[in-house]
Amino acid sequence: NLTKEKNVIDKNIIDEKVSKSTTELPILTEEDEQTIEVQETEAEGFEEQGIIAYNGAEKTPNIQLGEYAGLTYYSQLDNRWRHKIYSSVGNTSQTIGTSGCGPASAAMIVSSIKGNITPDQMADLYTRYGYRSPNQGTYWSAFKWTADVFNIEYSECYRLDDAINKLKNNNYIIASCNQGLFTYGGHFIVLVGIEGNYIKIYDSYLYNGKYDVASRRGKAIVKGYTTYVSIQDFRQYANYRKFFCFKNNRTDTK
């Protein structure tokens, strides 16, 4: 019974004393979501291009982070950056709002472990160093590069059970998902914790009513900026492809 389980979550699980840089969720529709650029999740040539970008990119750019504020949520639809161009080919219709789940997810990870960096700053880095594909979102290799640049312990896995073990071991995880519970095309989401039988998710394309549509109803619980999905439903409906894991080794976690 989802209503009963929601009450359990409300009483026992949700305790979010976190600093969130995004302060309100946007009001969008299912139709709006269906018009965004599809983030590639599995094409072999796409992955090869990402590897080429990684092998050719500088790994030690001097980047100044802001103050560490603990677990941080960013919406790619935040008005401060949603209309900023995120394109490697000068396409002004490619913005952080339409195409920026990759840099938004990575910005959440780095801000939550090291210090503040915003989605538009991360998007500029990805474009500058070759991790923005022409028409298919962000290359997967951007995340390994991000871990290199910001000195974060990093690993990858494909099995959900392995990802859950990583979550239990103080990792934040970017999950690449194909068409399913979280997206109509392809999308990156951030797994920030595990509470009981629920995975805690930061979705940069979360909007009011996203999980009220027929195909998603009853499969997710939204509380504030966090989406809770049971492990069973994630396994069945997320259509996940790969997990990019970042270890939080801080001892002063907020």
PLM features: residue spans?
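Active-site-adjacent structural segments surrounding the nucleophilic cysteine of cysteine proteases
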Residues: N1-Y131
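Cysteine-dependent hydrolase recognition
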Residues: Q94, P103, S112-Y139, E153-E156, ...
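Stable alpha-helical elements in mature extracytoplasmic
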Residues: G97, G102-A106, T118, M122, ...
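Active-site-adjacent substructure of cysteine-protease-like catalytic cores
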Residues: E153-L206, K210
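Solvent-exposed, well-ordered amphipathic alpha-helical segments
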Residues: I51-N55, I63-Q64, Q76, W140, ...
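Noncatalytic regulatory segments and standalone regulatory/sensor domains
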Residues: I194-K254
